[in-house]
UniProtKB/Swiss-Prot annotation:
Cystines in this chain: none
NCBIfam families assigned to the protein according to its UniProt record, in alphabetical order: glycerol-3-phosphate 1-O-acyltransferase PlsY
Functional description taken from the UniProt entry: Catalyzes the transfer of an acyl group from acyl-phosphate (acyl-PO(4)) to glycerol-3-phosphate (G3P) to form lysophosphatidic acid (LPA). This enzyme utilizes acyl-phosphate as fatty acyl donor, but not acyl-CoA or acyl-ACP.
Topology class, membrane: Multi-pass membrane protein
Subcellular location: Cell membrane
Keyword Aminoacyl-tRNA synthetase: no
Entry annotated with the keyword Membrane: yes
Pathway: Lipid metabolism; phospholipid metabolism
TM region positions: 2-22, 52-74, 81-100, 112-132, 143-163, 164-184
E.C. no: 2.3.1.275
Name used for this protein in its record: Glycerol-3-phosphate acyltransferase
A molecular-function term among this protein's GO annotations: acyl-phosphate glycerol-3-phosphate acyltransferase activity
Length: 213
């Protein structure tokens, strides 16, 4: 019974639409009607500012971490923490508290990985911010980190680097999360190809995007 309750709790944690609620409560703004219409970290930064964007990121990240740690906190045996983390990501993507229309799952997925394999998460953070500096695009960085996650989870155990052995559930979860993130960024990928993707005011913009075109 406790397992079912905690699995539901993991989904409900993921379903907290932090950006949407922050916009509505503190700014009287519905993020779905502004910018990209997304309720995640990037659009929150763009529309509501740095403080709101950072708050959204922190909440979205750590709800994934907390969900992953639920079975450890409650000394639950028999169900991998990754299942709880996956349910949090599903909740974030299809939140019951926001009409099942959620974000792109980047921050929450990162939080899940941090809760299960923190050094692997650090590796992905380095890839993410490296790509962000080179390309000046959150979307490109997210997709690049997703691909790097798949490469890492498949290759690192071969050399005992970061990941000491193969965990086939972790591989499956990484493949699922990476696929979800890339699919959720399909519109961004199209804009990148057309060189019209939105930029952050930092980095080299090596692909010469011009969102004003």
């Amino acid at each position: 019974m406790i397992t079912i309750v905690l699995l539901i709790l993991a989904y409900l944690l993921g379903s907290i639409p932090s950006g949407l609620w922050i916009g509505q409560v503190f700014f009287q703004i519905n993020l779905r009607e502004h910018g990209s219409g997304n309720t995640g970290t990037t659009n929150t930064f763009r529309i509501l500012g740095k403080k709101a964007g950072m708050a959204t990121f922190v909440i979205d990240f750590f709800k994934g971490t907390l969900a992953t740690l639920l079975p450890i906190i409650f000394h639950l045996q028999g169900v991998s923490p990754l299942i709880f983390g996956l349910l949090a990501v599903i909740g974030h993507t299809f939140p019951i508290f926001a009409g099942f229309k959620g974000g792109k799952a980047v921050a929450t997925s990162a939080g899940v990985i941090f809760g299960f394999a923190p050094i692997f998460c650090l590796y992905l953070a380095i890839i993410f911010f490296g790509a962000l500096y080179l390309g000046s695009m959150i979307s490109l960085s997210s997709v690049t980190a997703s691909i790097a996650a798949v490469i890492g989870v498949l290759l690192f155990p071969l050399f005992g680097f970061i990941l000491s052995n193969y965990d086939f559930l972790f591989i499956a979860i990484i493949l699922a999360l990476a696929s979800l993130i890339i699919i959720r960024h399909k519109d961004n990928i199209a804009r990148i190809k057309n060189k019209t993707e939105n930029l952050v005011p930092w980095g080299l913009n090596l692909t010469h995007q011009d969102p004003k075109k």
